[in-house]
C-alpha cells in the first residue's frame, strides 16, 4: 500500500521556487471502504462492484492525478456504480458519510449517465460526534468519483466536505463529457484539517459543458489544496469555474485552475473567476491560473479579486451594533449561502444551513 503520493500536478509547470507545481503528501494508508448511507430514487440503478469500476472508467482521468488511481487499485476496496435507467431521475441520489476520528477509508464511485438522461448526486461527507479532541483526530477520508456522460446527458454532483474528524481528506473527480452533455459540480468546503481536492472534466464532445461552483471557509490552521482542470477537446465546448471563499486564523489555501484548449477545439470558451476574502493577517493565499492554448479560435478568461473587508463597511456595521467577529462570520456565511442556493435539493440546503448555524454559535466559523 502506497504511503507517499504526489497529487494535483499542474499540466504545465511554473517556477519551481513557488512550490505550486504539485503537492506531496505522506502517511496515506487505507483499511477499507467507509459504510455509506445511500438513498437511491426511482430511475437510478446502484451496483456494487467488488473488483472495482468497469474498464470503461479507466480512461477517465481524475484531477488529483495517477497516484490516486494507484491508491484505489491497491486498496481493493471495491466500488459503487450509479447509472440512469430512464431519461430523468426527479429525486437526487443522496450519499451520506459519517466518519469516525481514527478510520482510514477509501470509497470509489462511478456515475454513468446514458444519452439524454438527467441525474443529481449529493455526497455529504460529515463527521460523527465522538467527543474526542481535535488532537486525537487521525482519520483519513478519501473518495474518488468518475463520471461518463453520454450525448446530451446532464449530471449535477454536489459534494459537501465537513468532516471535523479528518486529519486528511482526499477528494478526486474525473469526468468524460460527450456531445451536448453538461456536467456541473457544486463544492462546499466547510471543515477538515488538510483537505486535498482534484477535479478534471474532459470535454471531448461538441458543445459539451463543465461548470464548477466552489465555496469555502477555512480557519484554525487548516489547509485547502484545490486543483480544477477543464480540458477542451470538443468544438464549441464551454467551461465556467467560479470560486468564492474566506480565509482566517492562520489558514492556507492553494487554488490551481487550468483551462486547456486542445487542437481542434475551435469555438471553445473557458472562464475562471476567483474571489477571496482575507480576514486575518496570518493567512496564506496562493492562486495559480493557467490558460493553455493549442487552438487559435478559442476564448479564455481569468479574473481574481483578493482583499480584505472594506473599512467603511466595517465602520458602518460596527456603528449599527455589530461586533467585528460577528461581521466576519456574516461575510463567511454569505459566501457559502450563495453557492448553497445552487444545490437542487431543499433537504441538503436545510441540513447545511443548520450545520453552519451550529458552527457559528460554537465560534468555529
Task: Show which residues each predicted segment covers.
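Extended amphipathic alpha-helical segments enriched in small hydrophobics
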Residues: 316-338
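Long, low-complexity, mixed-charge
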Residues: 1-77
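Conserved beta-strand/loop scaffold segments within soluble protein domains that form the structured core
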Residues: 56-315, 319-322, 343-365
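A generic "cationic amphipathic patch" detector
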Residues: 2-36, 95, 130, 160, ...
Amino acid at each position: 500500500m502506497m504511503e507517499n503520493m504526489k497529487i494535483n500536478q499542474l499540466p504545465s509547470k511554473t517556477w519551481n521556487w513557488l512550490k505550486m507545481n504539485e503537492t506531496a503528501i505522506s502517511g496515506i494508508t487505507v483499511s477499507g471502504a467507509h459504510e455509506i448511507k445511500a438513498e437511491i430514487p426511482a430511475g437510478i440503478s446502484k451496483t456494487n462492484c467488488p473488483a472495482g469500476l468497469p474498464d470503461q472508467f479507466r480512461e477517465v482521468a481524475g484531477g488529483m492525478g495517477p497516484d490516486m488511481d494507484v491508491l484505489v487499485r491497491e486498496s481493493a476496496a471495491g466500488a459503487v456504480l450509479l447509472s440512469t435507467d430512464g431519461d430523468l431521475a426527479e429525486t437526487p441520489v443522496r450519499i451520506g458519510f459519517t466518519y469516525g476520528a481514527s478510520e482510514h477509508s477509501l470509497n470509489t464511485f462511478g456515475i454513468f449517465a446514458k444519452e439524454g438522461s438527467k441525474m443529481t448526486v449529493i455526497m455529504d461527507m460529515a463527521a460523527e460526534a465522538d467527543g474526542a479532541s481535535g488532537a486525537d483526530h487521525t482519520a483519513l477520508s478519501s473518495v474518488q468519483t468518475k463520471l461518463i456522460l453520454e450525448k446530451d446527458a446532464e449530471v449535477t454532483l454536489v459534494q459537501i466536505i465537513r468532516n471535523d474528524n479528518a486529519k486528511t481528506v482526499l477528494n478526486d473527480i474525473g469526468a468524460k463529457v460527450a456531445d451536448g452533455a453538461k456536467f456541473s459540480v457544486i463544492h462546499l468546503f466547510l471543515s477538515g484539517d488538510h483537505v486535498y481536492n482534484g477535479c478534471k472534466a474532459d470535454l471531448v464532445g461538441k458543445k459539451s459543458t463543465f461548470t464548477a461552483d466552489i465555496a469555502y471557509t477555512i480557519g484554525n490552521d487548516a489547509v485547502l489544496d484545490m486543483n480544477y482542470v477543464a480540458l477542451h477537446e470538443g468544438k464549441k465546448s464551454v467551461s465556467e469555474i467560479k470560486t468564492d471563499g474566506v480565509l482566517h486564523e492562520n489558514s492556507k489555501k492553494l487554488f490551481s485552475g487550468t483551462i486547456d484548449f486542445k487542437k481542434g477545439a475551435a469555438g471553445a470558451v473557458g472562464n475562471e473567476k476567483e474571489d477571496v476574502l482575507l480576514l486575518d493577517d496570518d493567512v496564506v493565499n496562493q492562486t495559480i491560473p493557467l490558460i493553455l492554448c493549442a487552438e487559435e479560435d478559442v476564448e479564455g478568461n481569468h479574473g481574481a479579486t483578493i482583499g480584505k473587508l472594506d473599512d467603511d463597511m466595517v465602520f458602518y456595521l460596527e456603528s449599527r451594533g455589530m461586533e467585528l467577529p460577528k461581521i466576519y462570520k456574516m461575510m463567511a456565511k454569505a459566501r457559502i449561502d450563495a453557492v448553497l442556493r445552487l444545490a437542487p435539493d431543499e433537504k441538503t440546503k436545510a441540513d447545511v444551513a443548520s450545520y453552519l448555524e451550529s458552527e457559528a454559535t460554537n465560534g468555529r466559523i
